[in-house]
UniProtKB/Swiss-Prot annotation:
Keyword presence, ATP-binding: no
Propeptide residue interval(s): 20-49
Tissue specificity statement from the Swiss-Prot or TrEMBL entry: Expressed by the venom duct.
Protein name: Conotoxin Lt7.1
UniProt family annotation: Belongs to the conotoxin O2 superfamily.
Nucleotide-binding is among the record's keywords: no
Domain notes: The presence of a 'disulfide through disulfide knot' structurally defines this protein as a knottin. The cysteine framework is VI/VII (C-C-CC-C-C).
CC annotations in GO: extracellular region
Compartments (UniProt record): Secreted
Taxonomic source organism: Conus litteratus
Cystine connections: 51-65, 58-69, 64-74
Annotated signal sequence range: 1-19
Membrane-traversing stretches: none
GO molecular function annotations of the record: ion channel inhibitor activity; toxin activity
Length: 77
């Protein structure tokens, strides 16, 4: 019974290391986290003046924090 337990543990260890190797190792999740952390929230963009808040005059959707420029004014979310 003890040998069977050890055998199962070794098999589980081998399967988990194989899964790490096939998925690109430990670097891939770190890259995703780094990519996602570069994005700013809407509040941060507004606070730093990178986009316009609700009810401001606008000429295109991209300059509004909400992404909606309706009748020349930024729309609320």
């Amino acid at each position: 019974m003890e040998k069977l337990t050890i055998l199962l543990l070794v098999a589980a260890l081998l399967m988990s290391t194989q899964g790490l190797i096939q998925s690109g190792g430990e670097n891939r999740p770190k890259e995703k986290i780094k990519f996602l952390s570069k994005r700013k929230t809407v509040a941060e963009s507004w606070w730093e003046g990178e986009c316009l808040g609700w009810s401001n005059y606008c000429t295109s959707h991209s300059i509004c924090c909400s992404g909606e420029c309706i009748l020349s004014y930024c729309d609320i979310w």
